[in-house]
Amino acid sequence: MKAGIHPEYHTIKVVMTDGTEYETRSTWGSEGATMHLEIDSKSHPAWTGGNQQLVDRGGRVSKFKKRFEGLGL
């Protein structure tokens, strides 16, 4: 491999929506950084049977619904 063209691979901490923490290796962030997940396998409707609501962060879901409300879907 060529030197100097690959991203740095380091250890980060990931915090799931229920507060569970684990360490993994990633190119995201920097050594020791913490990634807080907004959606994961414990909260995503595809994995929970669709019984939970998606959290509308940044108004994206409401913007989508407003844009397509006249289609009657």
Curated annotation (Swiss-Prot):
The keyword RNA-binding applies. It comes from the Bacteria. One of its GO terms (cellular component) is ribosome. The keyword Ribonucleoprotein applies. GO terms for molecular function: rRNA binding; structural constituent of ribosome. InterPro entries: Ribosomal_bL28/bL31-like_sf (IPR034704), Ribosomal_bL31 (IPR002150), Ribosomal_bL31_A (IPR027491), Ribosomal_bL31_sf (IPR042105). Keywords: Ribonucleoprotein, Ribosomal protein, RNA-binding, rRNA-binding. Binds the 23S rRNA. Part of the 50S ribosomal subunit. Belongs to the bacterial ribosomal protein bL31 family. Type A subfamily. This is Large ribosomal subunit protein bL31. It comes from Sinorhizobium fredii (strain NBRC 101917 / NGR234).
